Amino acid sequence: MPTIQQLIRDERSKAKRKTKSPALKQCPQRRGVCTRVYTTTPKKPNSALRKVARVRLTSGFEVTAYIPGIGHNLQEHSVVLIRGGRVKDLPGVRYHIIRGTLDATGVKNRQKARSKYGTKRPKPAAK
């Protein structure tokens, strides 16, 4: 245990917090260009073909981002907006693409949780 004199001379260093989404550089979202759009398989015990994209960001980073929802229109050179948020069963995927902004269209025929998938409110059915 240090003496009071040692603490005066060399104060205790604060533990530095490590960010979970360094590519955003403290911003809520970042714009980027898709360099590759592909599917990948999740960790055990899950099984699927998850849609992901490799995105080159305006901050200079190149990251892997998840494409949420059923069906998408993204391809190489699509401009997208990404946010933080990892995908638990995809190692290395720490970002999500925001649907309904820039080149990423909203999910079609989405009824619930529409705001999360960039879908406009459906027109009321004609009687």
UniProtKB/Swiss-Prot annotation:
Annotated coiled-coil segments of the chain: none
Domain of life: Bacteria
MF GO annotations: rRNA binding; structural constituent of ribosome; tRNA binding
Xref: InterPro entries: NA-bd_OB-fold, Ribosomal_uS12, Ribosomal_uS12_bac
Statement: the UniProt record of this protein carries the keyword Isomerase: no
UniProt key word Zinc-finger: no
A Gene Ontology BP annotation from the UniProt entry: translation
Basic residues bias spans: 109-127
CDD domains: Ribosomal_S12 (cd03368)
Entry GO CC: small ribosomal subunit
Residues covered by region (Disordered): 1-28, 104-127
3-methylthioaspartic acid, modified sites: 89
UniProtKB keywords: Methylation, Ribonucleoprotein, Ribosomal protein, RNA-binding, rRNA-binding, tRNA-binding
Family according to the record: Belongs to the universal ribosomal protein uS12 family.
Subunit organization: Part of the 30S ribosomal subunit. Contacts proteins S8 and S17. May interact with IF1 in the 30S initiation complex.
Function: With S4 and S5 plays an important role in translational accuracy. Interacts with and stabilizes bases of the 16S rRNA that are involved in tRNA selection in the A site and with the mRNA backbone. Located at the interface of the 30S and 50S subunits, it traverses the body of the 30S subunit contacting proteins on the other side and probably holding the rRNA structure together. The combined cluster of proteins S8, S12 and S17 appears to hold together the shoulder and platform of the 30S subunit.
HAMAP family in alphabetical order: Ribosomal_uS12_B (MF_00403_B)
Listed name of the protein: Small ribosomal subunit protein uS12
